[in-house]
Regions:
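Glycine-rich, low-complexity intrinsically disordered segments
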Residues: 1-154
Length: 154
């Protein structure tokens, strides 16, 4: 039997609008800028129901942990601006306006490929938004690319 392994480096993230019909306006830019993604955990709690003298357990809805998304920061196209625009949909610090979930939530797909480029695994995380924006370190010592970190709240 031939075994084909999933490699940790063969993946992409796709960000879609909540209706799922079209990629978000910044989707391709952020996909191409991706450096790494933290582990995605699928959790399912139990619901305990008292029934007569006994207890019955049922599975709950699947939930996901928040995931750390690391991106390479490019000046053109502007990765930081695209992330800030998405974050401003959650809360705009200039107008002090809190956004509506339909405005800032996105469907995020984590897609893994095999060595031939065939899709082997897709994790869909509906209702995802940016929890914060770490703008990356700065120093005068080298020519390293700035790494931007974004926790995705799923």
């Amino acid at each position: 039997m031939l075994r084909i392994y999933l490699k940790i480096w063969n993946f992409e993230i796709r960000v879609y609008n909540m209706d799922g019909s079209s990629p978000a306006e910044f989707s391709e830019l952020l996909t191409l800028s991706t450096d790494s993604v933290g582990a995605i955990e699928e959790n399912q709690d139990e619901i305990t129901v008292h029934y007569g003298n006994g207890i019955i357990k049922f599975p709950s809805k699947v939930s996901f942990n928040s995931v750390t998304w690391n991106l390479n920061c490019y000046c053109e196209p502007n990765v930081l601006q695209a992330l800030r625009d998405w974050r401003r949909l959650v809360y705009d610090t200039e107008t002090e306006r809190m956004g509506l979930p339909t405005e800032y939530m996105r469907n995020v797909y984590f897609i893994k490929y095999d060595g031939q480029g065939n899709v082997r695994d897709v994790i869909k995380c509906p209702g995802t938004w940016i929890g914060a924006l770490n703008n990356g370190e700065m120093n005068q010592q080298g020519g390293d690319i700035v790494k931007v970190t974004v926790p995705l709240v799923i």
